[in-house]
Amino acid sequence: MIDLDTYVRGVREGKRALVARAITLVESTRPQHRALAQELLTALLPHSGNAVRIGISGVPGVGKSTFIDAFGSMLTGLGHRVAVLAVDPSSSRTGGSILGDKTRMERLAVDPAAFVRPSPTAGTLGGVTKATRESIVVMEAAGHDVVLVETVGVGQSETAVAGMVDSFLLLTLARTGDQLQGIKKGVLELADVVAVNKADGPHEREARVAARELAGALRLMHGADAFWTPPVLSCSARESTGLDEVWERLTHHRALLDGTGQLTARRQEQQVDWTWSMVREELLRRLRTDPAVKDLAPVLEKRVRAGELTATLAAERILDVFGESPGPRP
């Protein structure tokens, strides 16, 4: 087994094999790995925090993997070291990591200045979020100065990612009629920059029109006194056009946050939110593994299914039993 000093030294020196092993360690849900993982993160924390953290989401069919491949390759060409992480709670259903996106990022996958990590399988959105947050610490300590966090799954994954990044990029497509069609409710409110992808060939003009219309809608949504109104740009990941402007707007947004003290405040609040998220996740883990709860739960679930007991009363009885359990928690 690799000791703490070897992990810390390997990560700080950017040794890919040890960086990968370190991320596997912090992703692990095994009890025997938890103590070492937290010691490692504590040692790496002072060496993290300097990267530009960008969340990326997109409507179905937007070409997100192609965009990240082109965007990340542009950044490594500019001298940056890029890490790509994914938040995909749906991957736990199949019991394996999402590898498809990594194989579609053909340039980044072989770029020595890039590190692409598929989504961990942690069983819950909270588990995946924890693993991704801790992976950010590892990647930053390894010298990656740009971290791209991709949302792959459904549900609340966009909100989870927005809670761990500095700026949030939404990728969308030119559409006939309502330009908001296909964009999940609530995601627009999270976006700091919007990019209309596939602005190439016969779709270039359509994309530019869509960008103008969406920009107007966002101005109405945010109001004239907003601290930041998300710019809407058009780009083509396939032709690598417009990507430099997307980067410029994202870095401008981050610089504005930094200059007003909001970046520090945002990251501090993210850490506090993370703390309480971990409290909820750990309480649920302890509750589910409590022997008394494991004995009682099937009985109560059966009664709830039969309509003999309300969900509220069942929950109260589970919590009562959990609170009465003697001895140390598992």
Identify the role of each PLM range.
Residues 176-205:
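Flexible active-site lid/hinge loop adjacent to a nucleotide/diphosphate
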Residues 85, 171, 196-197, 235:
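Generic beta-sheet signal
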Residues 19-21, 234, 245-323:
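Long, well-ordered amphipathic alpha-helical subdomains in the mid-to-C-terminal portions
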Residues 2-13, 17-62, 68-157, 164-171, ...:
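Nucleotide-state-sensitive switch-loop elements of NTP-binding domains
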Residues 322-330:
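Generic C-terminal helix-cap and adjacent flexible tail
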